[in-house]
Amino acid sequence: MEGKRNGQTRLAYVLGVPLADNCVRQWPQMQELVQGRELIGSVEGNFEAVTLEVGRRLRLGDVVVVEWSINYGDDRIYRNVTIGELEHGEAVRVTDYWGEPVNTPEWRVEMTARLEMPPDGVWPSKDRLKHY
C-alpha cells in the first residue's frame, strides 16, 4: 500500500485526524449513515482499487473541511468535500459530498470561464492519486 495513513481508515487520512470509536459518517446524496469507526473501515474495505489524494484541508476550530479527489478504479475522478466535526481532536461526525466532473452545458459555455485545475492544486489529477 502506497501513501501514508493517519489511522485505520482512509477517512482518517482525508481528515488528517483520527476517528472516534462512535464516529458517524453521513452521505446525504444516498440518504445513508455509517455508524462507528470499525464499520466505516469495513465499508471502505469494499473498494480495494481506490486511489485518492487531498488537495486542501482547512481546520476551523473543531471543524475540518477537506477538498479531495478519488478514483474508484474506473478512471472517473470524483471531486469531494468532506466536513468533519471534532471532539477532543477526533472526528465524531463526518459529512461527505461528491460529484463526478461533467461537461459544461452548451447554453452556459459563453457565460462562464474555465476553472484552472493544475495537477498539484486543490483538485489533484488522476496521476497524483494513491492507495491509502
What kind of region is each of these model predictions?
Residues 1-132:
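C-terminal and inter-domain tail/linker signature
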